[in-house]
Each structure stands twice: as structure tokens, then as C-alpha cells.
Amino acid sequence: MTATLEHTNFTVRDPKATAAWMRDVFGWKTRWEGAAIAGGYTVHVGSTHTYLALYAPENPRPAGESSYDTVGGLNHVGVLVDDLDATEAKVRAAGFKPHNHADYEPGRRFYFDDDNGIEFEVVAYD
């Protein structure tokens, strides 16, 4: 049996704006968007086989404690890219600040936080 991650669902301030920078930075496409089942609005953005569901509720609550200290918290999203340097330039152009650069076997990585407070790890393997 093979299991593959198909999607994850995140609460964001503005799904359309978040999807826009993800399309620009990662080259993804919008697969679907519309009214969410529980109210609010959702955009699905990603590749042919995997995506992120970006959800904005009608009445959002502010973020709580650090996700690294909260059971069930999202710590970061890892995205594999072919060209780390080109992706970092796109991250900067989108207005985000890369940090925690590191080389490790078998590749290189950096992190950035988006305007929703979600941390992304961008990695390229040698």
C-alpha cells in the first residue's frame, strides 16, 4: 500500500492574497476556490497531485501561543524546489525575509515566515 500526502488545510487572513504569492514564488496554480463548507472562503493552490487548502473563516480569531509549544500546532511547511537561489529571490521579491540558511546532507535550505505567521522551510537536494 502506498500513501501520499494529498493536501493540508491552513487558516489564513486572505486566501486569495496567500495563493497569489504562492503561485509567484513556487509556480503553483489555483486548483479550486469558493465558499467553504463551514462558511468563509477557501482557495486550493498547489500542483496537479498535491495542494494547500487556504481557508479564511467569517470571524477569525487571533493566533495563540507558539506552534512549537502547542500540541497539534503547525511548526512549518517544507517545500522542495529545484533551484534554491532562484526561489529565495522570489521569496524576497514577495516581501518576505529568509532566515536560518543551512547546508546539510543531502542539500541546502532556508526558512521564511509569511504574513499569516506560517513558517516555510524551502529545501533543495544536491
Where are these regions (language model features)?
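Short amphipathic alpha-helices within nucleic acid-binding modules
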Residues: 21, 85-90
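Short hydrophobic/aromatic beta-strand micro-patches
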Residues: 9-11, 78-82
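Conserved beta-strand in the GNAT
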Residues: 53-55, 121
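A short, acidic/glycine-rich surface segment
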Residues: 38-39, 60-65
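Vicinal oxygen chelate
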Residues: 88, 92-126
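Core segments of cupin and vicinal oxygen chelate
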Residues: 2, 9-52, 93
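Eukaryotic phosphotyrosine signaling hubs
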Residues: 5-7, 73-76
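Exposed loop/turn and edge beta-strand positions of beta-sandwich/beta-sheet ligand-binding modules
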Residues: 39, 73, 106
